[in-house]
Amino acid sequence: MRNFITALPIVLLLGFSFVSFMFQFEHLVYFRLALGLFSLVGLYMIYKMKTGIRYFIIYLYASWIVLAAVTAFEEPIFSSFFFGGLVMTMGYLTYMLIYLGMKQDRDANPV
């Protein structure tokens, strides 16, 4: 059950980024591909890292900046799709930080 709870948000995020191609395919195409790839790489990094939280945080914020830049490149600023892309980017950042906190809590050595 714990693994299901851990995996559910990222599955929903990946599902949204890839399944959403069925709707409004001409908007945020590169953004959705980048979101899915950054999510997969971030998940892999979280599950494989033993130390090096600082590197993951650098990766996370760098990917957040790239996603925001891709959104600004693909959509006119202040359009509804632009704000939708920024909201999905913040969701990605939030999910990854939640996963990082869950990993830290799970891997902590009891005193």
UniProtKB/Swiss-Prot annotation:
Cellular location(s): Cell membrane
Question: Which cellular component terms (GO) are annotated to the entry?
Answer: plasma membrane
What UniProt keywords apply to this chain's record, in alphabetical order? Cell membrane, Membrane, Transmembrane, Transmembrane helix
What topology does it adopt in the membrane? Answer: Multi-pass membrane protein
- Tell me the domain of life: Bacteria
**Intrachain disulfide bonds:** none
Protein name per UniProt: Uncharacterized protein YdbL
